[in-house]
């Protein structure tokens, strides 16, 4: 009779699972409720206490107050709409495409799995997944037909860092397109993953990246607008010494403080996000470049080349097509798409450059990456041969010393 530990039994009890699910739901719901509440309160403070109570004192200022109220209300609607547009669109995942799903993940663990990719220099590839196959009782793994990425739908340029095989996810059982990463929080792979945002309780990826950038821009503009309006009201209130016979609503004071804080923080993050858009780079790729830079200083990175004068320079980003093309590839082809939260993506498997599976690249930079990868492979092979030769010479010398005759 198998007796489980009490802690294990309690942890897997149905009521414990229900409590965990409820707590996760609350944690996911909190940022949405908090953001909506704060944003709605701000527009209330702006229109009611700022425009109606303070500015609508004479006929001349009434028109000005109405204009301020309409501008603030428009920015409020755009901020709220883009926020929920990010949630509704979602980041996108390879799991959404039947063609990218792997029928049998063990077929990729075959010792004779060959991949026809530009970096592949080895015919055979031993992986740890074959051990997993034996552990699960798959004795005849050679009889499993090896799967290959669907080349008719997906053109790959990024490979696994530890070998020359195409990237795939063992948790989601899908092929991973370029710039795709697995999110441990969402527990799924995300197309062109930028980052996981706690304020959305969701990842920012290919399908909602544009709306996320617009959300940051709208929120920065709205915060700056509230800050200017509340500052002017407070300045006039104290400059004209109205505090002697008038009361000032604390809502305007709180609006001034919060709008200033949001304008600085969100504005800084918005500037950083727009910089990445113009460079066609995700937050993950930006962070990877920082790690590579640190490794480069320690002599552990080879993502550079030497020019004619012998100076070292970086290879560059294969997805960087120039500021204009980078911007249009994410935000849309014209100013109409740039200003309004209009969808520019396509969730069809046949939409080559609009579904998050394929991306335009700088062919010249990509060729240099391939050439550099081949040189690295040759250097690694020469180093391995040298170490093997030294080891054999040492073993031969030891044999000679132990047997002089």
From Swiss-Prot:
Nucleus among keywords: no
Coiled-coil region: none
Q: Kindly report the protein's main subcellular placement as a broad class.
A: membrane
- The EC number(s) given in the record are 2.3.1.225
> What are the protein's GO molecular function terms?
protein-cysteine S-palmitoyltransferase activity
Q: What ranges are annotated Cytoplasmic (topological domains)? A: 1-27, 84-214, 273-405
Record-linked InterPro entries = Palmitoyltrfase_DHHC (IPR001594), PFA4/ZDH16/20/ERF2-like (IPR039859)
Which reaction(s) are listed as its catalytic activity? Answer: L-cysteinyl-[protein] + hexadecanoyl-CoA = S-hexadecanoyl-L-cysteinyl-[protein] + CoA
Parts of the chain on the Lumenal side:
49-62, 236-251
Keywords in alphabetical order = Acyltransferase, Lipoprotein, Membrane, Palmitate, Transferase, Transmembrane, Transmembrane helix, Vacuole
> Key word Oxidoreductase present in the record?
no
> Which spans are transmembrane here?
28-48, 63-83, 215-235, 252-272
**Pfam hit, one:** DHHC
Family label: Belongs to the DHHC palmitoyltransferase family. PFA3 subfamily.
Q: What is this protein called?
A: Palmitoyltransferase PFA3
Classification of source organism:
Eukaryota, Fungi, Dikarya, Ascomycota, Saccharomycotina
The protein's gene is named PFA3
């Amino acid at each position: 009779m198998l007796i489980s530990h009490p802690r294990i039994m309690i942890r897997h009890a149905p009521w414990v699972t229900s409590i965990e699910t409820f707590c996760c739901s609350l944690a996911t719901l909190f940022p949405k409720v908090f953001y909506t509440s704060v944003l709605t309160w701000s527009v209330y403070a702006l229109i009611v206490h700022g425009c109606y109570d303070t500015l609508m004192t004479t006929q001349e200022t009434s028109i000005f107050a109405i204009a301020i109220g309409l501008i603030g209300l428009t920015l409020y609607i755009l901020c709220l709409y883009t926020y929920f547009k990010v949630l509704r669109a979602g980041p996108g995942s390879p799991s959404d495409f039947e063609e990218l799903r792997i029928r049998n993940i063990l077929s990729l663990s075959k010792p004779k799995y060959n991949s026809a990719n530009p970096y592949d220099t080895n015919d055979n590839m031993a992986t740890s997944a074959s051990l997993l196959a034996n552990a699960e009782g798959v004795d005849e793994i050679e009889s499993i037909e090896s799967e290959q990425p669907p080349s008719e739908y997906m053109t790959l340029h990024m490979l696994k860092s530890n070998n020359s095989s195409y990237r795939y996810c063992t948790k989601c059982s899908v092929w991973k397109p370029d710039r795709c990463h697995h999110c441990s929080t969402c527990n799924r792979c995300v197309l062109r993953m930028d980052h996981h945002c706690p304020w959305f309780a969701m990842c920012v990826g290919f399908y909602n990246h544009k709306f996320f950038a617009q959300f940051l821009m709208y929120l920065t503009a709205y915060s700056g607008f509230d800050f200017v309006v509340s500052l002017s009201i407070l300045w006039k209130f104290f400059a004209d010494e109205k505090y002697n016979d008038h009361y000032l609503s604390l809502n305007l004071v709180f609006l001034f403080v919060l709008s200033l804080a949001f304008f600085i923080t969100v504005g800084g993050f918005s500037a950083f996000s727009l910089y990445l858009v113009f460079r066609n780079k995700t937050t993950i790729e930006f962070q990877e470049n920082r790690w590579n830079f640190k490794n480069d200083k320690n002599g552990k990175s080879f993502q550079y080349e030497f020019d004619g004068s012998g100076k070292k320079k970086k290879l560059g980003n294969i997805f960087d097509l120039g500021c204009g093309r980078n911007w249009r590839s994410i935000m849309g082809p014209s100013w109409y798409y740039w200003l309004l939260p209009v969808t520019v993506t396509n969730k069809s498997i046949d939409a080559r450059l609009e579904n998050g599976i394929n991306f335009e690249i700088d062919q010249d930079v990509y060729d240099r990456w391939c050439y550099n990868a081949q040189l690295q492979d040759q250097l690694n092979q020469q180093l391995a041969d040298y170490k093997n030769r030294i080891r054999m010479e040492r073993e031969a010398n030891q044999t000679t010393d132990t047997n002089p005759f």
